[in-house]
């Protein structure tokens, strides 16, 4: 991934297996969120490829990448990106505009322990409750790939551990890749990647390899 100062983050031959959960650990600025954005098709690498289900996202137009992300990828953003003045149900049902079937919403909210909040405005929720709503919105699509950027960043360890457990348990066979700063959560995942070792910075270079 290239930056305006000519530097680059390089990820070489990273491969993620189906139906596995991955924790991405590493210091701030080591490229964890950048990797998620590459996998989501939000960013494009300066060189190399990003292949998901046999499709190279770098060969798709931005519109095609957006369509692929809507259909195949669930992204849980660090800042949630929920509409505060709308209810929990309305935030999830907005996905209908993108062709997503949300008929399983009640069952999913029940599994996440927030069905009672279905008709409550998001602005009235706690940080942990908003986190679960963001998870529900991502999982309602039954995505093949689930990306989570610091899904426990605003929570204490005990609450964060419960959220991670719920995320993994409700992934419904999808591959989960989650950024976390808390090494204590690592044992919850099938595999752990130390991004300080996986990614490297090059001054004046360009991104190489395949994700």
Language model feature labels by segment:
Residues 121-125, 129-131:
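Conserved ABC ATPase signature
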Residues 146-149:
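Catalytic Walker B motif of ABC-type/P-loop ATPase nucleotide-binding domains
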Residues 140-144:
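A short, proline-enriched helix->beta-strand linker immediately N-terminal to the Walker B motif
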Residues 57-74, 170:
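ABC ATPase NBD coupling module
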Residues 40:
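Helix-to-loop junction immediately C-terminal to a conserved catalytic motif
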Residues 48-56:
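Conserved ABC transporter NBD signature motif
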Residues 56, 100-117:
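Conserved ABC ATPase "signature" region
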């Amino acid at each position: 991934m290239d930056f305006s100062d000519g530097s680059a983050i390089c990820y070489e031959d990273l491969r993620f297996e189906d139906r596995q959960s991955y924790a991405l650990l590493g210091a701030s600025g080591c490229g964890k969120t950048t990797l998620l954005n590459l996998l989501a098709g939000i960013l494009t690498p300066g060189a190399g490829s990003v292949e998901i289900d046999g499709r190279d996202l770098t060969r798709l137009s931005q519109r095609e990448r957006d369509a692929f992300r809507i259909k195949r990828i669930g992204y849980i953003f660090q800042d949630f990106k929920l509409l505060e003045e709308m209810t929990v149900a309305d935030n999830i049902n907005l996905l209908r505009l993108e062709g997503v079937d949300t008929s399983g919403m009640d069952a999913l909210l029940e599994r996440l322990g927030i069905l009672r909040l279905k008709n409550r405005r998001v602005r009235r929720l706690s940080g942990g409750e908003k986190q679960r709503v963001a998870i529900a919105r991502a999982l309602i699509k039954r995505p093949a790939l689930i990306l989570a950027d610091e899904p426990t960043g605003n929570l204490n360890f005990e609450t964060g551990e419960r959220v991670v457990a719920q995320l993994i348990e409700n992934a419904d066979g999808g591959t989960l890749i989650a950024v976390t700063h808390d090494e204590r959560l690592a044992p919850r995942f099938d595999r752990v990647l130390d991004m300080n070792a996986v990614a490297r910075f090059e001054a004046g270079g360009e991104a190489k390899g395949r994700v």
